[in-house]
């Protein structure tokens, strides 16, 4: 009966510890205990927490004869099991020294046994980690079993060290069973609380990550196409559906670009910004949060608006300049979730990166267009000079041929300067090249032969404008024009799987890699193809000196619309 009463008293003490553990689980202090880590701050926190439990287990223990029935083993074993041998040993030493300071027949034996209990927990920790069984560390059965063995070891140490021996035997017979039961159950329940908190934390973390990934996938590349009303509305609708919040708005520096959710009847896209929260975020570049309680929120557009809180996050572009804001709202009857707040700030960074990438891409495209215009400026005067001289020479002997050459020259410049779009058909590109070649053939006469072999089924394939002409011009200007014999240029096309292959071959074999302006045309074509389609595409060169130069252009096959 005495043992049963002692069990009840120790269980009461254990319940106090479990309540404290449960309260701790609601604080950030509990988070480091939920994972196996080698970080020093986490291990130090583990040492502090379980040392306190260890000391409390002794302090609130029950005095029996010249000893103390206690739940100290819970702190020592859990410290070792979760923190490892070093933490377990230090927790045991701290708890043991505290017990030794209280004196009594078992002071020394209890100090030693507490250190052993901490080391035993640490030993099990090391074995499980080494075997890759981290899940077993957080198993309540493991915690209970290790504590049960630790208590058995403690009783053996008391019998071995405490004197008089008869008193030690009597003490062990009275406290062994109650302490084994309560400490075992207490350690298992403590681990259960920890495991439940860990499962909940992982659930929220996985849900958070899944939402973040889904939002990232759904909004990928939208704002790269331009920071405007259409694209902003697409992003706002995705966020509204995925975040389960009251409303979402996106603004630039002056007006509302998009709004969806509660209050969309008066928050209309195109309206100038009137919210002080938005203006403050744009002016300071900082996140503005009005929770509706500590920081009151009031809609500036409608006195009866049902929105009760808002989070305004700046969107940044080049040089960290604020380009606009993203605003998340909650209704008056709902709290603004801290998860949505954190997620919102992360999404704002993602969208800012898209805006910045879009700005860079547009700048890159403008630079490429400038290079193309530069190439036109280089080619046109030189070619025009030669063409006019050729026409002048032809007009004296064959006015009809001269008329055709004028027509070819007109076609060349029309195609060269007034391309309707960035992409043209292969047939259009060949027409452009042919106009150039007809003038060059009139200039070189029998010294230049041209063969164009383009299958009819490839004629509607799309490719970037001004792709072939610079390559063909290089073949003549730096190749066949240098020959004393007849120069030959062959242009062909074929399909290879999902690729369109274009070849320009001359019989000069005079190709030399160049990095100066003389090679600007071909280098620019190669650069455009790689930037547009990737490094798997572009120009490759094969040259057999004094025999041939073959330029191969690799483009993606584009199915006809």
Curated annotation (Swiss-Prot):
The keyword Kinase applies. Residues 1-3, 65-72, 130-140, 192-561 are cytoplasmic. Signal peptide: none annotated. The keyword Transmembrane applies. One of its GO terms (molecular function) is ATP binding. Its EC number is 2.7.13.3. The chain crosses the membrane at residues 4-24, 44-64, 73-93, 109-129, 141-161, 171-191. GO terms for biological process: cell wall organization; response to nutrient levels; signal transduction. GO terms for cellular component: plasma membrane. It is found in: Cell inner membrane. It is a multi-pass membrane protein. Disruption phenotype: Deletion of btsSR has no obvious phenotypic effect under the conditions tested. It catalyses: ATP + protein L-histidine = ADP + protein N-phospho-L-histidine. It is an enzyme of class 2 (transferase). Autophosphorylated. It comes from the Bacteria. Keywords: ATP-binding, Cell inner membrane, Cell membrane, Kinase, Membrane, Nucleotide-binding, Phosphoprotein, Transferase, Transmembrane, Transmembrane helix, Two-component regulatory system. Its main location: membrane. Residues 25-43, 94-108, 162-170 are periplasmic. Residues 354-559 form the Histidine kinase domain. Disulfide bonds: none annotated. Interacts with BtsT and YhjX. Member of the two-component regulatory system BtsS/BtsR, which is part of a nutrient-sensing regulatory network composed of BtsS/BtsR, the low-affinity pyruvate signaling system YpdA/YpdB and their respective target proteins, BtsT and YhjX. Responds to depletion of nutrients, specifically serine, and the concomitant presence of extracellular pyruvate. BtsS is a high-affinity receptor for extracellular pyruvate that activates BtsR by phosphorylation. Activation of the BtsS/BtsR signaling cascade also suppresses YpdA/YpdB-mediated yhjX induction. This is Sensor histidine kinase BtsS. The gene is btsS.
